[in-house]
Amino acid sequence: MSDSVFIYAFTRYGWVEECIDIDEVAYVDFEKSQICLKAHDAQIPRMIQTTSVDLYNVEKALLRNRR
């Protein structure tokens, strides 16, 4: 069973709450404050601009899933 995390993503409409599946996260970039999701059918992976608190929450969930 995969974990999901709620984050606040910055879009052209402002801050939007979004639920992402941890299994879909490729990596977390703390310098750019972005979460990069895996690209399956798309050629370009999706980058989500978010807050530092959400970056740490996603990182904790990724580490928890490794165990």
Language model: regions and residue ranges:
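Acidic, Ser/Thr- and proline-rich intrinsically disordered linker/docking segments
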Residues: 2-18, 24-67
